[in-house]
Amino acid sequence: MSLNIKLSEEQMLERQQNIARLKENEWIQLFLEQNHLDASFVEENSGVLLQWIKSVSACRNCKGLDYCVQKIRGKATKLKIDDSGFLNEYYASCQYEQKRDQQLAHQSKFRFSHMSLNDYLIDLNDASFLNAAKEKDYMAAYTQSVSSIPLNQGVYLYGNPGTGKSYLMKGICNYYAKNNKSVSFVQVPLLIQELKQFMTDNEYRQRVMNHLRYSDVLVLDDIGAESITQWTRDEILLPVLDERMNKQMKTYFTSNYSMEELEQQYRLANKPNNTIASLRILERIRTLSKPVELSGKSRR
């Protein structure tokens, strides 16, 4: 069944005006030329072409993804003629989306990560690092952390909350990932919550533990802030640290506690062999990393 929809005079006039504007449009003229089409093509496909021009015009003065007004963020409408001569619409990444994809390409090297999307954009050469490095205390921590990259031993970065420890370690992670190393960035308190939530899912736990054991580079962020039990200490952290120490795998830590304070944190009251278990954890942390203090005011 065919439908013949009759336009009003006003609608006919508007359509004719739109077609006239389309024929004069530089983008339409270029499209016709590239595809060896004549003006009749505009008349037959005016609706699609009009929407395409609106999309192209919206992108023309765009300042970036944060200002995108397209239906799908970062995607521009494109047109092509298929082998049968029919006009097809499709979406393609705009220049800003392509740039963002390039900036995030190293994300595929992360085996396990609690980093946000914007965290993957952190670069050790960012102005934020360079400005912060003007502060004497931050410069020392930044320099020692970056200097650890070619060495076997990582860094145990400790200090008060908000001094920029996690931010610096995320930059370190991105550096390794961009240099083709497998990386895991783990917020220890969040990790423990997730493992408790999936306590009965042995497959999930084993998969996560393997990521932590075997990533080329591991960052244990905010260690000591988790809800500490014998299970979290002896069944989660110790096997990971033991594996990485034995295989001399690059490991970093951030904490609000010094190593000495962390040792006290892991001594659980009224539990057998507490001192020995705590010492075993700290022995591995000391073997895997060098303590570096990041003091100063909060940078949040």
Regions found by a protein language model. Name each.
Residues 59-115:
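Interdomain "pre-motor" coupling segment immediately N-terminal to P-loop NTPase/helicase cores
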Residues 119-148:
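N-terminal pre-Walker A segment at the start of P-loop NTPase domains
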Residues 149-169:
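Walker A/P-loop nucleotide-binding motif
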Residues 174-185:
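Post-Walker A helix-loop "phosphate-sensing" segment adjacent to the P-loop in P-loop NTPases
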Residues 185-191:
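A short hydrophobic beta-strand->loop->alpha-helix junction that borders the nucleotide-binding pocket
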Residues 196, 200-249:
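Conserved nucleotide-sensing/catalytic segment adjacent to the nucleotide-binding pocket
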